[in-house]
């Protein structure tokens, strides 16, 4: 009897308690056998060996047909091999396909006690136990065998411990899985809340966009009648333009016919003899044209009568043809070189607020300055002594322009009005009201009967001085119209706008004839050269462009930025272009050589610049309320 390894003290105490209470058989025999096999215990078994008799051995008979030795191989080794193979085949055939079930025999009580005593080293107790145990067996007391099997407590404990460990591992895994699931749940809840909030925000934005869309639809619907009226007006104006062009062609033909008739009449008066023949020949030649000319004359008279009855009898008439431009007689290249060596000569503080405009009287050495202090002043040159001060506007002045005769002055203001002043008396003789926002610029027509103005309300207006009303409103710009000017001695207008375009208009019809594109920023000013061949414009980033007015194409672009160009002006020869810049510098551009000269003298922004009639003196106004003279 022997034991493989020792037992723990706790197991011994459990065993002693079980023996003291009387052991009873319990547990499943198969589970106990598995536990004992896992423990590796040894068993004590009594075996009686009897001597076997060879006479009682039963030999297996092998049939001759199943055991035969081939010819030529009748030796002992072959015979033994054949016999073994035959026996193996028979055993395989007789073997059952179903494996026998495993039967575990539990450890008997006496073997268990003996193993326990040996492990504990209790040899004397073991001797006493064995003596008494075998003595009882010899006496025939066999009731002890019927007690039954004692369950293997140690094996059960080990199994329970293993199961407990496995359960703890499973519990740990489940806790980890639960923690991970909790984290995932929190993350999913946060994402759910985020997406819910995002969804609510999107729903609110969608509802807002829907409301805005509805408002825009209503807004656009309110514009449809206006657009329809404008389209009708546009078509009407186009028809009127076509009729006007046809009538103009007819009038030109009539004038040419009259001129030829006058020439023939003059020839007839100079030669009295053949006067009758000439008259008869003229009558024969003009016989087909006579009724036509007569009909045209009658139609014109009827149209004039209808116009007088239908319109305002005080309305002025635009000149039919372009008037001769006296500046065209000036030589293209002046014999004297252009002047660029201007130096600051005098500084006159005339206004308390920035100077917005200075302008020269057309025929005399008189200068007018306008300021944001709501005043305009007439200055006598060259000392710039104040001759007259005018006031009447309720807001800052933006621009001024002399009547072609020089006896009247037009001023534009931030109070949305244009006023006409009598320079002899210094009184306001007329006020034009119609713009909805500040008026930026004004200009006189060469005939002196019309004043044009441009405004922050994206429109320009043409005012009739005689009828004292607005004759036409020019629509087309999409932003503030910053400047306006009449082409010299014609009915053509030039406007510059914050929508980065220049527009050319027919003042008689109010139709935009052409738009010029090229500036990338708001255009602050645009002006014709004295001969009317070029246009100069400057924008809010200091870029100055020259345009060919005859071809309506850009000539050159000059970047003098980044300070804005506030105003541009030509000298009387048209060779020098001056630009007043936002950094206080006056730039002089030589149009012949392309050189740029700078005049430094303004401490702050330079708002306006103008040349004297002879080009020897330059006047500039700045944001400090001063007018400076350069010579």
Curated annotation (Swiss-Prot):
WD-type repeats, residues: 350-389, 392-431, 434-473, 476-515, 518-557, 560-600, 601-630
InterPro entries linked: G-protein_beta_WD-40_rep (IPR020472), WD-F-box_domain-protein (IPR050995), WD40/YVTN_repeat-like_dom_sf (IPR015943), WD40_repeat_CS (IPR019775), WD40_repeat_dom_sf (IPR036322), WD40_rpt (IPR001680)
Listed PROSITE patterns: WD_REPEATS_1, WD_REPEATS_2, WD_REPEATS_REGION
Coiled coil start-end: 152-267
Presence of keyword Cytoplasm: yes
Compositionally biased residues, Basic and acidic residues: 277-287, 295-304
Region annotated Disordered, chain positions: 266-332
One Pfam family per UniProt: WD40
Assigned keywords, A-Z: Cell projection, Cilium, Cilium biogenesis/degradation, Coiled coil, Cytoplasm, Cytoskeleton, Flagellum, Phosphoprotein, Repeat, WD repeat
Tissue: Isoform 1 is detected in testis. Isoform 4 is detected in testis and brain, and at lower levels in kidney, heart, pancreas, thyroid, ovary, adrenal gland, spinal cord, trachea and liver.
GO cellular component labels: axonemal central apparatus; axoneme; extracellular region; sperm flagellum
Function (record text): Necessary for sperm flagellar function. Plays a role in motile ciliogenesis. May help to recruit STK36 to the cilium or apical surface of the cell to initiate subsequent steps of construction of the central pair apparatus of motile cilia.
Known partners and oligomeric status: Interacts with SPAG6 and STK36.
Protein name: Sperm-associated antigen 16 protein
Organism: Homo sapiens
Gene: SPAG16
């Amino acid at each position: 009897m022997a034991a493989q390894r020792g037992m723990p003290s706790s197991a011994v105490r459990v065993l002693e308690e079980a023996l003291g209470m009387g052991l009873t058989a319990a547990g499943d025999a198969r589970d106990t056998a598995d536990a004992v096999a896992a423990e590796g215990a040894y068993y004590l078994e009594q075996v009686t060996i009897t001597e076997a008799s060879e006479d009682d051995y039963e030999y297996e008979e092998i049939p001759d047909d199943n055991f035969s030795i081939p010819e030529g191989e009748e030796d002992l080794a072959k015979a033994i091999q054949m016999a073994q193979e035959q026996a193996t085949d028979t055993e395989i055939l007789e073997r059952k396909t179903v494996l026998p079930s495993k039967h575990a025999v539990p450890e008997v009580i006496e073997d268990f006690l003996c193993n326990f005593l040996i492990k504990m080293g209790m040899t004397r107790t073991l001797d006493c136990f064995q003596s008494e145990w075998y003595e009882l067996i010899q006496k025939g007391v066999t009731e002890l065998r019927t007690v039954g099997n004692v369950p293997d407590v140690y094996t059960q404990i080990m199994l329970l411990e293993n199961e407990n460990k496995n359960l703890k591992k499973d519990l740990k895994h489940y806790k980890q899985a639960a923690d991970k699931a909790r984290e995932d749940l929190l993350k999913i809840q946060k994402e759910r809340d985020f997406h819910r909030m995002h969804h609510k925000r999107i729903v609110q934005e969608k509802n807002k966009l829907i409301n805005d869309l509805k408002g825009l639809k209503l807004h656009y619907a309110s514009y449809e009648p206006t657009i329809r009226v404008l389209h009708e007006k546009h078509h009407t104006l186009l028809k009127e333009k076509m009729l006007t062009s046809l009538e103009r062609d007819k009038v030109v033909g009539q004038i040419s016919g009259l001129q030829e008739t006058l020439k023939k009449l003059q020839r007839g008066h100079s030669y009295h003899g053949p006067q009758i023949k000439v008259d008869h020949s003229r009558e024969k030649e003009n016989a087909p044209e006579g009724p036509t000319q007569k009909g045209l004359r009658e139609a014109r008279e009827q149209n004039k009568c209808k116009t007088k009855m239908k319109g305002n009898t005080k309305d002025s008439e635009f000149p039919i043809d372009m008037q001769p431009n006296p500046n065209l007689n000036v030589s293209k290249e002046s014999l004297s070189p252009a002047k660029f060596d201007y130096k600051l000569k005098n500084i006159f503080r005339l206004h308390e607020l920035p100077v917005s405009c200075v302008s020269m009287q057309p025929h005399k050495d008189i200068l007018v300055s306008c300021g944001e202090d709501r005043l305009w002043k007439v200055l006598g040159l060259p000392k710039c002594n104040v001759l007259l001060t005018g006031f009447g506007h309720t807001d800052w002045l933006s621009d001024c322009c002399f009547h072609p005769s020089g006896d009247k002055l037009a001023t534009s203001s931030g109070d949305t009005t244009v006023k006409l002043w009598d320079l002899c008396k210094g009184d306001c003789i007329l006020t034009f009201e119609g713009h909805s926002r500040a008026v930026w610029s004004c200009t006189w027509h060469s005939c002196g009967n019309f004043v044009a103005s441009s405004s922050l309300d994206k429109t320009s207006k043409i005012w009739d001085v005689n009828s004292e009303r607005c004759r036409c409103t020019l629509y087309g710009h999409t932003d503030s119209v910053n400047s306006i000017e009449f082409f010299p001695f014609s009915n053509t207008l030039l406007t510059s706008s914050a929508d980065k375009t220049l527009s050319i208009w027919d003042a008689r019809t109010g139709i935009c004839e052409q738009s010029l594109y090229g500036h990338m920023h708001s255009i602050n000013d645009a002006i014709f050269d004295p001969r009317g061949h070029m246009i100069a414009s400057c924008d809010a980033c200091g870029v100055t462009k020259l345009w060919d007015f005859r071809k309506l194409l850009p000539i050159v672009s000059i970047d003098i930025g980044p300070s804005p160009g506030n105003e541009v002006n030509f000298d009387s020869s048209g060779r020098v272009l001056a630009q007043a810049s936002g950094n206080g510098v006056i730039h002089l551009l030589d149009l012949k050589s392309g050189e740029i000269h700078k005049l430094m003298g303004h401490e702050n922004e330079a708002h306006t610049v103008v040349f004297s009639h002879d080009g020897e003196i330059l006047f500039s106004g700045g944001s400090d309320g001063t007018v400076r003279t350069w010579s």
